[in-house]
Amino acid sequence: MIYLILSGISAFFGLTAGLGTTTLLRPLLDAVSPLEPASVAMLCTMATLGAALVTAFFALGRPLPLHPDELMLLAIGASLGGVLGDLASARFFSSLTRSSAMLLQNALLFTIIALPSVYFGQLSHMLPPLRANRLFSLPTAFAVGLLGSFLSFGATPLTLMLYAFLFAADEEESTIAALTVSLFAMTGKLIVLLIRQRFQLPDADALLWLLPGAVGGSLLAMLPALQGRQAGVGNALLRLSLFTSLLNIAAALT
């Protein structure tokens, strides 16, 4: 039941704030779940993918702000990053203890969440956007997909920051780019994960609670009355996610 509640709340507030499903769910599961890091990674992957599919379904009913060629570059880069990220995480974390794996994961997660928080809070007023060629969306999606897959985390805040800084993208463009990267990175990761697990998902009983929560929370966030990014909710969610990551780091060090 706790997985249903946590995934539903994380998906609802994450999508309402425009920051993705697992921005809060990832550190929360590290904090409260007794499962092994590999099982937590699988749960977060499925939650991210389920919520991304719901969001993509509703997004297809509106004109897309990005050119189809750019969406293709994002999909290719994110898929490759997702595949390589899962291979890297499986090899890397298999040699670590649970506490060491949690320490590294949450240190990286804290950094990835803190950077966009600092950028949108202060640096965006000081650093002018680069307005780079949109062809660079391919390596950008690859890098974000690699990190997101490595941490089993959609990395939506990182995509939003990079698209705003590198391409001077508006909110709608950045949101669609983040959705595309999250969707294809997690798809690539899931394919490799299933092959490694011989198409058997560990801790499927927890998944049966978590996935309905993620999908249900996403559907609620898609209600017309709740559309539009909520800055106050987003700031609170980022702070809570950072605080939870710090608690996980402290727990791993003790």
Regions flagged by a language model, labelled:
Residues 44-48, 178-182, 206-207, 211:
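Short hydrophobic/aromatic, small-residue-rich stretches within specific transmembrane helices
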Residues 42-58:
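Transmembrane alpha-helices of multi-pass small-molecule transport proteins
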